[in-house]
């Protein structure tokens, strides 16, 4: 499978901008969609990039490199202190929780507390707020981060379309913070030494639910030219984070039912936006991961 080695190449190519601009100019429905996207994104871009970035669920203070789980639940985080904040894994394999997922506007910036998360208990009268261990919060952490990454993806697209720097600044801040946080964090370790160790992902409890990848891949591709200039010293870190993610998705999972198909989409997406194998010392670039999906078995 041959791909263009230039960016953009994931959702569009070098001709896509002109075609999209023409569509927006000529079709009222396209103009309406585009304006609504701008309005939604401006709510955050106009606050400055740090507002949205600071709501990411990260180990802002401890910079934990190790996440420990017990079966299908989070247990604790620790390990050596990374040189930058690291990304939190979600609280449990199941979505079920008594607690209400807060809106982004209700989150405090740079929140990391040894007591866990401060959430409203939706099962009690008046929905009182409580400090709760992350293990009881289902997929709230992942849901928050995926929403933020989705906004950043939209900002990257808007920068590509308009050239407005506020969109690039927002997208780059979120992307850089989160991907650096993945790069410096390891795959979670199951203290029960059970089957869950073969399923767990970098952001979720199952490698088939690494939803963050769905936002990060197009974000990176739309923002590539900006990152290549503004974050040139971080490009190897971004590639390393993507490759760590893909490698873990290859290593984990189950050999039956539909897991292989669900894993393949993430691996293929990452392969499509990496550079050629020759660009990396380990020779694991776009061709390597695409070949793994098309011609090899994990």
Task: Set out the residue ranges of the language-model regions.
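A compositional/structural signature marking long, glycine- and acidic/polar-rich segments
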Residues: 269-298
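Extracellular glycan-targeting catalytic surfaces
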Residues: 1-255, 261-269, 291-297
């Amino acid at each position: 499978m041959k791909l263009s080695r230039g960016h953009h190449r994931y959702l569009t190519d070098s001709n896509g901008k002109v075609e999209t601009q023409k569509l927006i100019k000529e079709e009222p429905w396209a103009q309406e969609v585009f304006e609504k996207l701008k309005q939604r994104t401006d709510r955050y871009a106009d606050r400055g990039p740090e507002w949205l970035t600071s709501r990411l669920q990260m180990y802002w203070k401890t910079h934990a490199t190790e996440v420990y789980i017990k079966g299908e639940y989070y247990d604790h985080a620790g390990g050596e202190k990374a040189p930058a904040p690291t990304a939190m894994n979600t609280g449990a394999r199941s979505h079920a929780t008594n607690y209400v997922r807060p809106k982004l506007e209700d989150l405090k910036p740079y929140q990391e507390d040894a007591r866990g998360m401060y959430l409203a208990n939706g099962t009690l009268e008046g929905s009182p707020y409580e400090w709760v261990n992350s293990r009881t919060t289902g997929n709230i952490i992942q849901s928050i981060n995926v929403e933020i990454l989705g906004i950043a993806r939209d900002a990257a697209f808007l920068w590509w379309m308009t050239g407005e720097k506020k969109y690039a600044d927002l997208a780059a801040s979120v992307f850089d913070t989160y991907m650096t946080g993945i790069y410096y964090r390891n795959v979670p370790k199951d203290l029960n030494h059970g089957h869950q160790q073969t399923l767990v992902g970098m952001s979720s409890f199952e490698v088939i639910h690494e939803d963050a990848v769905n936002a990060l891949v197009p974000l990176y591709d739309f923002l590539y030219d900006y990152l290549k200039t503004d974050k040139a010293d971080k490009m190897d870190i971004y590639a390393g984070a993507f490759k760590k993610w893909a490698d873990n998705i290859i290593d984990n999972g189950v050999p039956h039912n539909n897991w292989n198909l669900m894993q393949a989409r993430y691996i293929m997406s990452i392969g499509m936006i990496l550079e050629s194998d020759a660009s990396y010392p380990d020779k694991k670039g776009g061709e390597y991961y695409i070949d793994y999906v098309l011609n090899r078995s994990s």
